[in-house]
């Protein structure tokens, strides 16, 4: 069997966490079975669909590494095809024109609500043959009235609906534009989609889509409906729970593989394993192992995963992403140490790339001010002898390598009768502007001799100026 899956977002906003997880599951399913992953843009909502949203979706997919094999296909390019299938359904008696006015439908609904019945269209135009003057009709699918429609869901097992529960769905509006449930069916048919993995908010759409496909004489794809994602308070995940856009996580300093790893574990598991490479995700992924209940989004767990990936990923890979974050701070990475070396120095104490970029600014650019508390504690008259001694030794050190720099620090402490920390902390504040940095020999090595000496000179001037 050829496996063909699709991700079909509507371009009315950014790629959000729920959509990204759906895309990931569909992508993994295709990759696991050697199949094809298709990207389809469902842009028939002309009022809300924007080019900016399309670009945001494509950018998010690229950043996550979810490459698609076919597409992107746009529904707005396929209106002629939708009209063709619509006419086929009309000619074969599977669809009909409905001339009911809004007032009639409102009256019908009000009566049903009053009788505590489920609001639904009663099919009154099923047998109407004559058009009504001045009324532009919609087109409705003639849903079967007997029997049931059922499918073996990839996630939830057997699901069945009685056809008597389903009314005659509108498949074309009065202006002729097709509706969601109809375009999806035609697209899945034409693109030979074999498996559909999507959110469980689509469960009620599935029986309608299956019936339309059967009316067209084709076998429906296999469906799998994934439970929604909740916030910690049990409500559906939204902006009030924090970031929901994939690219917002990039902007906040997360690695794409950390977010992928978190998303794949959000409702799916493989034993007790927490960390998955992409290859392992593909190897182990099984739609049957997706949980039936909603998953709860835990930002602390995502942050933990991100730190894990910062610690254990190839430093060159992390540095590639760090350069982007340095650029956001208007820092040119060529005007200082190699970002690969910065990653190695900083990753143990930084949980995000934003933290790492901000903590590494002093390597590339002189700072305007010292951290007030650090300067008050360490840049004092008592620190001057140690800073002056360090300045002399560092100016003539044989090699600007870490072991020689460490030796200078130790020798200065012994010479001054001070512990290493009493020597290193004033120096750290002098060169980094704060009392927090990588180990002192590493910091000096990355900073370079000229910058180090200039900053010691500046610190000594700062201390002198405080006397006045």
Curated annotation (Swiss-Prot):
The lineage of its organism: Bacteria, Pseudomonadati, Pseudomonadota, Gammaproteobacteria, Methylococcales. Its main location: cytoplasm. This is Glutamate--tRNA ligase 2. Coiled coil: none annotated. It comes from Methylococcus capsulatus (strain ATCC 33009 / NCIMB 11132 / Bath). GO terms for cellular component: cytosol. It catalyses: tRNA(Glu) + L-glutamate + ATP = L-glutamyl-tRNA(Glu) + AMP + diphosphate. ATP binds at residue 239. Its EC number is 6.1.1.17. It is found in: Cytoplasm. Monomer. Signal peptide: none annotated. Belongs to the class-I aminoacyl-tRNA synthetase family. Glutamate--tRNA ligase type 1 subfamily. NCBIfam families: gltX_bact. Its cofactor is Zn(2+).
């Amino acid at each position: 069997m050829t496996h063909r899956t699709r991700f079909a977002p509507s371009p009315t906003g950014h790629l959000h966490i729920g959509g990204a997880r759906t895309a990931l599951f569909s992508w993994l399913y295709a990759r696991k079975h050697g199949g094809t992953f298709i990207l389809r843009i469902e842009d028939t909502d002309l009022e809300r669909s924007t080019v900016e949203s399309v670009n945001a979706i494509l950018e998010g997919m690229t950043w996550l590494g979810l490459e698609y094999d076919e597409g992107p296909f746009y529904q707005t390019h396929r209106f002629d095809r939708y009209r063709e299938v619509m006419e086929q359904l009309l000619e074969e008696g599977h669809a009909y024109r409905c001339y009911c006015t809004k007032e009639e439908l409102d009256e019908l609904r009000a009566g049903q609500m009053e009788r505590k019945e489920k609001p639904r269209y009663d099919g009154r135009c099923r047998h109407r043959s004559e058009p009504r003057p001045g009324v532009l009709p919609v087109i409705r699918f003639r849903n079967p009235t007997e029997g049931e429609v059922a499918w073996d869901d990839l996630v939830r097992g057997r699901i069945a609906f009685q056809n008597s529960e389903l009314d005659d769905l509108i498949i074309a509006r009065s202006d002729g534009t097709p509706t969601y449930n109809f375009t999806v069916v035609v697209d899945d048919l034409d693109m030979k989609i074999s498996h559909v993995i999507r959110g469980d908010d689509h469960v009620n759409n599935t029986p309608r889509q299956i019936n339309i496909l059967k009316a067209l004489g084709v076998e429906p794809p296999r469906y799998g409906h994934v439970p929604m994602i909740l916030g910690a308070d049990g409500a559906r995940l939204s902006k009030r729970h924090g970031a929901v856009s994939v690219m917002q996580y990039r902007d906040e300093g997360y690695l794409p593989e950390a977010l992928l790893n978190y998303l794949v574990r959000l409702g799916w598991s493989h034993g007790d394993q927490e960390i998955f490479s992409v290859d392992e995700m593909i190897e182990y992924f099984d739609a049957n192992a997706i949980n039936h209940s909603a998953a709860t989004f835990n930002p602390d767990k995502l942050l933990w995963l991100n730190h894990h990936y910062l610690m254990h990923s190839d430093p060159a890979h992390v540095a590639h992403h760090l350069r982007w974050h340095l650029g956001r701070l208007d820092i040119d990475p060529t005007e200082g140490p190699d970002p690969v070396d910065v990653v190695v120095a900083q990753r143990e104490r930084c949980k995000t790339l934003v933290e790492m970029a901000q903590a590494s600014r002093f390597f590339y650019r002189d700072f305007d001010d010292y951290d007030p508390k650090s300067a008050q504690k360490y840049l004092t008259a008592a620190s001057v002898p140690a800073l002056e001694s360090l300045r002399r030794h560092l100016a003539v050190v044989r090699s600007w390598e870490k072991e020689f720099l460490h030796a200078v620090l130790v020798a200065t402490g012994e010479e001054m009768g001070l512990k290493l920390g009493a020597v290193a902390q004033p120096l750290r504040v002098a060169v980094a502007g704060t009392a927090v940095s990588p180990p002192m020999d590493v910091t000096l090595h990355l900073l370079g001799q000229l910058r180090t000496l200039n900053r010691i000179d500046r610190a000594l001037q700062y201390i002198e100026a405080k006397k006045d």
